[in-house]
């Protein structure tokens, strides 16, 4: 297990852990360009808003953290490799027990349909991973997270490494120096997640 103090210190310094998919070896990432969701201007797709209006999904916070992280760590049809090792899973479950890691669960007729998890420190939320089993479930979870973070006064939603999916969802990239300025401001803010 990753020592909790070391993990939290790493986040405060702009690092986050990943595991090599081939052997589970842990390494620390601090990309030169960082993906963020702009909390003040983020808008979900029309499809997500339509699903919201219809009440198709029920959304919860921290109702089943372990199920969410294990679903995120599971191999996917389009990508059988995962960067979420058993060591990462166990560490984040422990951090959740300490009240610092959180999940958003999206349920369809009571069944877990999608969700996401991450870590909250000060006014920053570090989104780690998301998954879905039904269309748009992870995007509904993301929209609820953004609304919740706005309500609580968070300043940052870190999506870490840009990819085409995050870009389609509305993430933007900022250079490392700008990211660190934003992070320092967010860490100074005292904000409860729940």
Swiss-Prot record:
One of its GO terms (molecular function) is leucyl-tRNA--protein transferase activity. Keywords: Acyltransferase, Cytoplasm, Transferase. It holds the Pfam family Leu_Phe_trans. One of its GO terms (cellular component) is cytoplasm. It catalyses: N-terminal L-lysyl-[protein] + L-leucyl-tRNA(Leu) = N-terminal L-leucyl-L-lysyl-[protein] + tRNA(Leu) + H(+); N-terminal L-arginyl-[protein] + L-leucyl-tRNA(Leu) = N-terminal L-leucyl-L-arginyl-[protein] + tRNA(Leu) + H(+); L-phenylalanyl-tRNA(Phe) + an N-terminal L-alpha-aminoacyl-[protein] = an N-terminal L-phenylalanyl-L-alpha-aminoacyl-[protein] + tRNA(Phe). It is found in: Cytoplasm. The keyword Cytoplasm applies. The keyword rRNA processing does not apply. Its EC number is 2.3.2.6. It is an enzyme of class 2 (transferase). InterPro entries: Acyl_CoA_acyltransferase, Leu/Phe-tRNA_Trfase, Leu/Phe-tRNA_Trfase_C. GO terms for biological process: protein catabolic process. PANTHER family: LEUCYL/PHENYLALANYL-TRNA--PROTEIN TRANSFERASE, LEUCYL_PHENYLALANYL-TRNA--PROTEIN TRANSFERASE. Belongs to the L/F-transferase family. NCBIfam families: aat (TIGR00667). Functions in the N-end rule pathway of protein degradation where it conjugates Leu, Phe and, less efficiently, Met from aminoacyl-tRNAs to the N-termini of proteins containing an N-terminal arginine or lysine. This is Leucyl/phenylalanyl-tRNA--protein transferase.
